[in-house]
């Protein structure tokens, strides 16, 4: 699976997480819900492990990626991707939104002008073929554009700021590559909702909420803008209005956990959190123990690289297991 660079990505922790889950479950645990899917790494891994999956996220870019995972790769999609990758930006009569907003043409440096034009022309052509492809194929193509565009972004990881000079990866020509090349079908139900209001039933509910006050809507807004442009805001980045998660607010996070635990029906909740999160380990154990037996596993993990020099290398990653009485 091609992926976007993501704060809090579980790419390096997914094997550990699923190993810990397997120690506590048996063959009757067939349904896996990923309530904060983000880059969809955990949804993808659960599908690889043959779970029936539910995937949810508040952010539109994540919803598009998870829907892209529903779609099997095919010769038809391969041909479309090759055709779109070969498009010549010289055929663009009028510069597109990304070019005029997020490249030097718009006095911003999220993408080179050439790559911004490629994003625009591919996005425009995906929209033109919307009536000729299925909904899943359409989302597959959009998701492929997001991961391809993200591979040439001129930022550290997030889109909260762009770099003053183009880095080497940003100067490369964007290759329009498929989100994945899995040709088999999967069982995946998708949602674009607040996790506190998600009334679903599952065996395993995996919860990977924001750990702190960083709003993902602000940090990845450019991906949403590629999908559906909104009026840009003032300031250097042109940040538009965006969705805000209550899990990023110190005053609301505990109540948000309570609402989620009450509204989601699961046999086992598996919750990722860390020593730098808004709630302490003790606070989490006290809160979660109100709903069932709570167990916590701790592992040292490398800090997000942009923060290493300021506060050291390691952070404690917590994995809380809450066994719900049936």
UniProtKB/Swiss-Prot annotation:
Uppermost EC category: transferase
Conditions for induction: Expressed in the early phase of the viral replicative cycle.
Enzyme Commission numbers on file: 2.1.1.72
Claim: ATP-binding is one of the keywords in the record: no
Catalytic activity annotation: a 2'-deoxyadenosine in DNA + S-adenosyl-L-methionine = an N(6)-methyl-2'-deoxyadenosine in DNA + S-adenosyl-L-homocysteine + H(+)
Pfam families documented for this protein: MethyltransfD12
InterPro entries: Ade_MeTrfase_dom_2 (IPR023095), DNA_methylase_N6_adenine_CS (IPR002052), MeTrfase_D12 (IPR012327), SAM-dependent_MTases_sf (IPR029063)
Entry GO MF terms: DNA binding; site-specific DNA-methyltransferase (adenine-specific) activity
UniProt pH dependence: Optimum pH is 8.5-9.0.
Keywords: DNA-binding, Methyltransferase, Restriction system, S-adenosyl-L-methionine, Transferase
Stated family: Belongs to the N(4)/N(6)-methyltransferase family.
Protein name: Type II methyltransferase M.CviAII
Organism field: Paramecium bursaria Chlorella virus 1
Gene giving rise to this polypeptide: CVIAIIM
């Amino acid at each position: 699976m091609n992926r976007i660079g993501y704060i809090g990505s579980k790419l390096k922790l997914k094997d550990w997480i699923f190993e810990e889950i397997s120690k506590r479950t048996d063959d009757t645990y067939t349904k896996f819900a990923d309530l904060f899917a983000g880059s969809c790494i955990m949804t993808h891994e659960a599908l690889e492990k043959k779970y029936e999956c539910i995937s949810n996220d508040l952010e539109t870019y994540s919803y598009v990626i998870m829907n892209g995972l529903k779609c099997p790769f095919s010769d038809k999609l391969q041909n479309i991707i090759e055709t779109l990758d070969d498009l010549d930006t010289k055929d663009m009569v009028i510069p597109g939104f990304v070019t005029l907003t997020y490249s030097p043409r718009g006095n911003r440096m999220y993408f080179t002008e050439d790559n911004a034009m490629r994003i625009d022309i591919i996005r425009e052509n995906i929209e033109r073929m919307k009536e000729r492809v299925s909904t899943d194929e359409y989302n597959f193509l959009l998701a492929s554009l997001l991961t391809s565009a993200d591979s040439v972004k001129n930022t550290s990881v997030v889109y909260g700021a762009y770099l003053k000079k183009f880095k080497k990866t940003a100067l490369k020509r964007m290759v329009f590559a498929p989100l994945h090349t899995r040709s088999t079908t999967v069982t995946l139900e998708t949602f674009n909702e607040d996790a506190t209001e998600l009334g679903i039933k599952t065996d395993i509910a995996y919860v990977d909420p924001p750990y702190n006050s960083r709003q993902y809507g602000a940090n990845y807004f450019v991906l949403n803008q590629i999908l559906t442009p909104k009026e840009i805001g003032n300031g250097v980045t042109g940040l538009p209005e965006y969705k805000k998660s209550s899990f990023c607010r110190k005053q609301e996070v505990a109540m948000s956990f309570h609402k989620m635990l009450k509204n989601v029906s699961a046999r086992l909740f598996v919750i990722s959190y860390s020593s730098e999160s808004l709630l302490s380990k003790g606070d989490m154990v006290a809160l979660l123990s109100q709903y069932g037996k709570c167990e916590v596993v701790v592992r040292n993990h490398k800090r997000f690289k942009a923060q290493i020099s300021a506060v050291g290398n390691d952070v404690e990653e917590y994995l809380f297991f809450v066994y719900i009485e049936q």
